[in-house]
Amino acid sequence: MGTLATELKNNQKNDPSVTKIRIDWIKKNTIGQAFDFFKSSKVTYDEAYHHVGIYSFRYETLKKFTSLTPSINELEHKLEQWRALDARMTIGVNYVKDVPISVDTKKDLINVENIIKNKL
């Protein structure tokens, strides 16, 4: 299982709509392994990154992941990544410099609508 991470900007550190990821880097800011995901603005770490919600799976890994029931941590944090971590699955992480625009909140939707209007 793999995912992406990028720089966590100052205005995102306390934003509960931004999922943060902590990574054990194998090659600094290139390739690593996830060990924590959180949204809380009450928790701050110097080495937290912005989790980009894009995943890759090998077929067998996807079968295993989808067969698992939600874990206690997944339900508590409302983050599906915890299901994999609690099942001792490895989540590989690649660092990316640029992130595509995502629409996770009403504010994000308004932002994208404004971008489209300005381009027309």
Specify the residue positions occupied by each region the protein language model found:
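Conserved alpha/beta core of the MobA/IspD/sugar-nucleotide pyrophosphorylase nucleotidyltransferase superfamily
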Residues: 48-120
